[in-house]
């Protein structure tokens, strides 16, 4: 019996978009690791166990949601557009035996957008596995998810509370026998938190959104959009019912905050 050979590799990326009326800002964390596999004279063992790749992708989604449930996270919903993006990229990695989030010259955000997915957040996990003895469907699915679970950056994507949808692709290289898996996660643009602030007071007001400071002149309205649940703090402004101190809120989609002056001095904040 020939000795068993097992190899694996994992990469993760998170892409988030931060929106204000103008300008639009984007923040991307993108590892530039790149590997190209050269099997030399090695030929994949065609007699080795062969998993069902479509069922492996389904298993990865199921195991991911089970892992999220154990950590009090909501389940991710399968999205066809994310699934196509993930499968197309897995096929590319397998066809070229390359390993990088930008192996095809594109960012994950570009790949999902090309499939028509309008996102507020996108995250991606990729990995490859090899075992000379092959894998069953169950073994391969568990190998991928176990590897991601034990990697801090991949684990962060698996458990991100602000992600809502998932697509998974799995492919096998005919040249090297490596199995490649891609997880694309998303929060759709439709779930962005959009809220407004109107200054009806007689002077400029100051506030922060997620720690970033803003000043709003009288009679102006500003619209903020965030992909993650924001924190809003008005400095030196009292919320209705507050006896003292600054007014703090957790805005929801569609909220409208109006700041008004008070006869006795100071300001009040009304949320609708």
Per-range role (PLM):
Residues 228-242:
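A short, solvent-exposed beta-strand micro-motif common in secreted/extracellular proteins
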Residues 108-184:
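A well-ordered secondary-structure block
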Residues 239-267:
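Structured interaction patches on ligand/partner-binding surfaces of diverse proteins
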Residues 12-23:
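Bacterial N-terminal signal peptides
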Residues 28-33, 38, 81-136, 159:
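Short, surface-exposed glycine/acidic/tryptophan-bearing loops
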Residues 30-96:
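A short alpha-helix/helix-coil micro-patch that ends at or immediately precedes a cysteine
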Residues 48, 70-84, 96-108, 153-161, ...:
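Surface-exposed patches in mature extracellular/periplasmic domains of secreted proteins
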Residues 193-203:
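Asparagine-centered strand-capping/turn motif at beta-strand->loop junctions
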């Amino acid at each position: 019996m020939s000795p068993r050979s097992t190899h694996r590799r994992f990469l993760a990326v998170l892409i988030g978009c931060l929106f204000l009326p103008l300008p639009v800002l984007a923040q991307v964390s993108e590892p530039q690791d790149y590997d190209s596999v050269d099997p030399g004279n090695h030929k994949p063992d065609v007699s080795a166990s062969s998993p069902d790749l479509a069922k492996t992708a389904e298993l990865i989604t199921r195991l991911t949601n089970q892992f999220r449930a154990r950590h009090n996270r909501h389940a991710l919903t399968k999205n066809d557009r994310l699934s196509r993006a993930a499968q197309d990229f897995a096929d590319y990695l397998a066809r070229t035996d390359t390993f990088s989030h930008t192996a095809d010259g594109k960012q994950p955000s570009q790949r999902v957008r090309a499939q028509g997915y309008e996102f507020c957040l996108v995250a991606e996990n990729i990995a490859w596995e090899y075992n000379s003895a092959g894998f069953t469907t169950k073994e391969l699915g568990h190998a991928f998810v176990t590897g991601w679970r034990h990697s801090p950056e991949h684990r962060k994507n698996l458990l991100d509370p602000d992600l809502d949808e998932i697509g998974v692709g799995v492919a096998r290289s005919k040249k090297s026998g490596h199995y490649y898996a891609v997880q694309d996660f998303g929060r759709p643009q439709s779930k962005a938190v959009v809220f407004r602030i109107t200054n009806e007071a007689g002077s400029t007001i100051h506030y922060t959104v997620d720690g970033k400071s803003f000043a709003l002149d009288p009679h102006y309205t500003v619209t903020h959009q965030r992909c993650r649940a924001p924190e809003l703090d008005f400095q030196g402004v009292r919320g209705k019912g507050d006896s003292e101190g600054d007014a703090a809120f957790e805005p929801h989609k569609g909220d409208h905050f109006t700041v008004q002056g008070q006869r006795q001095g100071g300001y009040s904040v009304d949320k609708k």
